[in-house]
């Protein structure tokens, strides 16, 4: 097969193993990555590349309804974690 015939597929992110979350239920893992992402961008800025790892992780682990609700809570000022 030549390089011209090769078809590439889009990259699908899969979260790796995190020793802090050894169980099958990944709810806490989802939550922690969401919080870590927002703490990271507040501390380092949106353009800081390592923050993207947290973004990819929470987007792959969390149902979209969860992080949309958390975004609404952050905007309303009643998010349960202090991110600063």
UniProtKB/Swiss-Prot annotation:
Disulfide bonds join 30-62, 40-51. Its main location: mitochondrion. It holds the Pfam family COX6B. Residues 27-70 form the CHCH domain. A motif (Cx9C motif) lies at residues 30-40. InterPro entries: COX6B-like (IPR048280), CX6/COA6-like_sf (IPR036549), Cyt_c_oxidase_su6B (IPR003213). It comes from the Eukaryota. One of its GO terms (cellular component) is respiratory chain complex IV. Keywords: Disulfide bond, Membrane, Mitochondrion, Mitochondrion inner membrane. It is found in: Mitochondrion inner membrane. GO terms for biological process: oxidative phosphorylation; proton transmembrane transport. The Cx9C/Cx10C motifs are involved in the recognition by the mitochondrial MIA40-ERV1 disulfide relay system and the subsequent transfer of disulfide bonds by dithiol/disulfide exchange reactions to the newly imported protein. Belongs to the cytochrome c oxidase subunit 6B family. Component of the cytochrome c oxidase (complex IV, CIV), a multisubunit enzyme composed of 11 subunits. The complex is composed of a catalytic core of 3 subunits Cox1, Cox2 and Cox3, encoded in the mitochondrial DNA, and 8 supernumerary subunits Cox4, Cox5a/Cox5, Cox6, Cox7, Cox8, Cox7a/Cox9, Cox6b/Cox12 and Cox6a/Cox13, which are encoded in the nuclear genome. Component of the cytochrome c oxidase, the last enzyme in the mitochondrial electron transport chain which drives oxidative phosphorylation. The respiratory chain contains 3 multisubunit complexes succinate dehydrogenase (complex II, CII), ubiquinol-cytochrome c oxidoreductase (cytochrome b-c1 complex, complex III, CIII) and cytochrome c oxidase (complex IV, CIV), that cooperate to transfer electrons derived from NADH and succinate to molecular oxygen, creating an electrochemical gradient over the inner membrane that drives transmembrane transport and the ATP synthase. This is Cytochrome c oxidase subunit 12, mitochondrial. It comes from Neurospora crassa (strain ATCC 24698 / 74-OR23-1A / CBS 708.71 / DSM 1257 / FGSC 987). The gene is cox-13.
């Amino acid at each position: 097969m030549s390089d011209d015939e090769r078809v590439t597929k889009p990259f699908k992110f899969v979260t790796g193993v995190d020793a802090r979350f050894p169980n099958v239920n990944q709810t806490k893992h989802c939550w922690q990555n969401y919080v870590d992402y927002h703490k990271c961008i507040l501390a380092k800025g949106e353009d800081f590349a390592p923050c993207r790892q947290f973004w990819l992780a929470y987007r792959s682990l969390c149902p979209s309804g969860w992080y949309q609700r958390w975004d609404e809570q952050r905007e309303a000022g009643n998010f349960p974690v202090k991110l600063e």
